């Protein structure tokens, strides 16, 4: 299947560090445009963190003009307060994308790992090394949160950007 040229933004939501990765698809080949992290750990309260997430995701969308966005779904943990905060962070990132009328797909962490490495239980380091190979990167990003964002974008490309039972499409909630 030939995929038309497009830019995909991948997001890995977090409450202390949020990772992102941006890839360009040209003639069905992937190229990394940018990757990085949004540092949130120095901000005093959760509301300021949410504000920064919204602003930075909005900036990334305005700067790189992605055609589609992929976001990692929160994993299920035992600490309810942490899960609520993570859900808010993801929701704010999604709201920033949706205000720009972009389609967004959500992928479970296991689905992303499976798409990148062939193993849904792969470590972050294994995912990073496979991304290095797939994207022909000379060196890995310094933060694994950045590679997680990049992995979401690559997973979305591998899935063809089409909804299936493993992901949710938030572009058409009418």
Q: Which residue ranges define each predicted feature?
A:
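Phosphate- and other anionic-substrate recognition elements at nucleic-acid/protein interfaces
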Residues: 1-174
């Amino acid at each position: 299947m030939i995929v038309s040229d497009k830019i995909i933004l991948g997001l890995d939501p977090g409450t202390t560090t949020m990772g992102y990765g941006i890839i360009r698809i040209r003639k069905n080949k992937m190229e990394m445009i940018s990757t990085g992290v949004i540092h949130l750990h120095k901000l005093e309260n959760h509301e300021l963190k949410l504000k920064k997430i919204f602003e930075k995701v909005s900036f990334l969308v305005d700067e790189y003009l992605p055609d589609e966005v992929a976001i990692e779904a929160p994993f299920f943990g035992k600490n309810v307060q942490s899960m609520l905060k993570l859900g808010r962070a993801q929701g704010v990132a999604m709201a920033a994308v949706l205000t720009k009328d972009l389609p967004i797909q959500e992928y479970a962490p296991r689905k992303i790992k499976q798409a990148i490495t062939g193993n849904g239980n792969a470590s972050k380091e294994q995912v990073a090394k496979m991304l290095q190979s797939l994207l022909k990167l000379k060196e890995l990003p310094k933060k694994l949160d950045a590679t997680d964002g990049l992995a979401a974008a690559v997973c979305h490309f591998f899935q063809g950007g089409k909804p299936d039972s493993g992901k949710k499409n938030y572009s058409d909630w009418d």
